Design a protein with these regions (language model features):
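Structural motif
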Residues: 24-31, 67-74, 109-113, 148-155
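C-terminal structural cap/anchor segments
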Residues: 39, 49-95
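C-terminal soluble interaction/assembly domains
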Residues: 75, 93-98, 103-115, 119-134
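Blade-level signature of beta-propeller repeat domains, shared across WD40, Kelch, NHL, RCC1
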Residues: 120, 126-155
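Short loop/turn segments that connect beta-strands within the blades of beta-propeller domains
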Residues: 15-16, 22-25, 54-55, 69, ...
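Residue position within the beta-strands of beta-propeller blades
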Residues: 21, 60-61, 104, 142-143
């Protein structure tokens, strides 16, 4: 493979001898310890805005194609199989995977998706700015906010 004119801003460990490397146009999976070999390569045509890896899932957020859906979320497994392709109407600032769920947050709102792309929750969860969110299990989340810490539980 040629890596000329490519950016690789993020590499995640995916087990004892596997890695996920995010590039400006997609991601690649490498396996092996001494001389890792590329086993999967996924390329996207659209602009990738955010990426995350956890629980054997790769999540890419791309620029959407309309004002009604400013973003598009694609979910892949480590074999490169696309599991979901969802248009998003939620204006997010942060993407993370916690407790086997995809969390999109902005200043005061949270949007939760399953690792298969099904929306579980979307709404306001804070009166002040959310700085960090941590999954605590059983649909409970700890919010680190501008003015303190609070616990929320999603039904």
């Amino acid at each position: 493979s040629s890596y000329t004119d490519m950016l690789c801003p993020q590499i995640e460990t995916a087990g004892t001898s596997s890695w996920v490397a995010f590039f400006d146009n997609g991601f690649r999976v490498y396996e092996g310890t001494n001389k890792p070999k590329e086993t999967v390569s996924v390329s996207e045509d659209g602009e990738i805005l955010s990426c995350a890896y956890a629980d054997d899932r790769v999540v890419l957020i791309l620029r959407g194609e309309s004002d009604d859906h400013p973003y598009r979320m694609k979910i892949y497994n480590l074999k490169g199989k696309q599991l979901a392709d969802e248009n998003l109407d939620f204006y997010y600032q942060n993407l993370q995977i916690e407790e086997k769920q995809i969390l999109l947050t902005n200043r005061q709102e949270l949007c939760v998706y399953t690792l298969k792309g099904r929306k579980k929750y979307s709404g306001m969860v804070s009166e002040t700015q959310i700085h960090e969110i941590l999954g605590m299990g059983q649909n409970r989340y700890l919010l680190a906010e501008e003015d303190g810490v609070s616990m929320i539980r999603l039904k």
